[in-house]
């Protein structure tokens, strides 16, 4: 009796706690934050139709036989109120409703939607005959979006549509989407989540017409307004991820992480594939071990210590899960989960994976919360089992992404706030302070402070589940085949995903399975990873497929290590672009045509993309040429001056349409260009135990590129989740505090006195978030050597003489190092008489190409002589060396100039 009474009492308490937690939980907050109702002033309506003018370019068309219309948020749409009344006029003529906005001309006959009765003309697109949309039209020149997965793809796959098109219009169909509502009961049962996804109460056609012409960025930004912004990622997500499908033991994995540290190779995230849980020792009566939630004690005898050891090494951890088979009787949590869904554990009946059952969902997350309390930071949701649930039209992948992402940032619940009696944090040891802070379950076991528990960043790792999936980063693109074809598709695939707002893809860098070994392929893939949204190395359990750099030849190993180190160095730049993506609606990776939509050349370079505000990237996705010993790619440079990011060589693109050229790089380098006036902040790498350091750095290197004025605002924060809600150094978050620190940098290429000046302004906002003092290395890349006497450094207007000034001839870089600068001070570096742009070292670069080229020596001599004597005019002579003697073969040596070598020399001779 007492056991039954205790169970009943626990059930009552659980129900009370569930209701209390649901009222302020993440799922309810998500619903309450939404603005799903359209503005009354922008609605036109008949008995069965409704038209919402959301903006002057974004129109919602609804037809409902029942006369009911949808005002709930849906799986895709969270906001239909854009905060302003768009400009439009309405007239009735010849039985037609005509809506005229500055961007669109809509005609509608008031009848069920038809090709003849509903059309929209997009204004301002004069060079296409397809700028008129009739209901039901298939898009002809949509610029595409992304796809669910690259699983088992060897190269190109079809992509879904995006919200932009060269014809000026795109349509998103939301008719089949489920709605999300606040619901404390589902089918008569208590719903611990407080919100639920359910089918629409009525059937209707529900379309969103994007008619932005060639205003591509505006279209994507309004897509974010409609569907919700991209969240701010935690800083660790932007570093290097180590992932491998491999049966590591606990000690083996930690030893590997320690070797990376000794080698000076930084990682921030450990991805533990499925062998963390029981797989091979599962009794066949339960099915396969593909799904599992119980640690494999043979491989990980003390998993809590393992997770703690990873954290001590500066690594966050995600575990792979395949949820398909639910929770079975061999699992550690089976009894608790079975009871929650009404199954007697003694029967060993499997608990079905059913996301339409609130009892299962609640128990499912309790199971995950227990493991998170042990040290798991987020989850890799490896769903591969299709799109069917018990609820028609509800994709289980979408539900997993939605629920897991919101749950991951839940903070402490009310029940957890009462579970922290043994918390050891400073605030909780203050007299009378304990009740004011949120606690972690099992604090005494892990000794985790209140601040850590309350600072849960939302993050999940899963496949794309349709428009709106950008709300649930990071995206897992699936198991990639190791081929050049796979690499060749990824730059286009990544950039094009931005057309549907999906900016945080994570690919299997280096490829996951099958394919073949090609060391240059791996090196080029690592380089692309450095300039990808997320850089996650991954491979299968084959003994031949390890991605550790020391498994490769010396030059490839060095290239790989350099790529991984550069990625970590770029964290200040990447984190700033992370803020830009979250608060300005501009993804890190952009197709080239976003900035130049009316330039046909911008559409002809699918492998090329912009990487944030300052850089242009053109990855090499084919093998090195045997003769030149270099890799190549075609590049389009928009009008202006550009500088090689690594060595400062100057490229001039004078024409309005830009410039196309073939560029060549050795295996240690990829084509990355900075704009004139570009500013790129990097952090200096730590050593030893600090190699994986994720704190706001004490030492920074800032690359500054000449030829134009420039500015950059470095975004940093105190690491708190509250910073993800504010986004501005001047804005207070929900807790009434400022968490963001802005450091503004400006570059005056030539001021009124012809001097060059670079200024780092005092920090604004949360100064406590960054080191009180910093060491700065300002590197002016691509400039001529100057007299160091012309360089003047001032801190708050006072001369600073404790500086180091050097010049590197290889990278054409003037370096100015200033140490221990207060972050609240203003640092000025002035070069009297101004810096000069460096002359490209044509002879030296040509000599380097010819030195390594596999070709006749006599041709090298002839080519080098011609270049020295004639410069750019030598191009006409280079092909004449590809001849054999006409007469006596005894007096001459056959010569030859491979086309690839000529092309590499052309790039050098014609750069500027």
Please give the residue ranges for each predicted region.
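Catalytic-domain carbohydrate-binding cleft regions of carbohydrate-active enzymes
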Residues: 4-5, 9-28, 34-35, 106, ...
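N-terminal-proximal low-complexity accessory segments that begin disordered
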Residues: 29-67
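Short, well-ordered beta-strand segments enriched in hydrophobic/aromatic residues
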Residues: 51, 59-63, 99-106, 616-619, ...
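A low-complexity, Ser/Thr/Gly/Pro-enriched, surface-exposed linker/loop concept
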Residues: 54-94
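Surface-exposed beta-strand/loop patches in extracellular or lumenal glycoproteins
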Residues: 59-67, 625-638, 765-786
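Solvent-exposed beta-hairpin/edge-strand motifs
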Residues: 71-77, 635-649, 778-801
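Hydrophobic or amphipathic alpha-helical targeting/insertion segments
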Residues: 100-118
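Accessory, solvent-exposed terminal regions and/or long lumenal/extracellular loops of proteins
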Residues: 674-801, 808-811, 818-824, 828-912
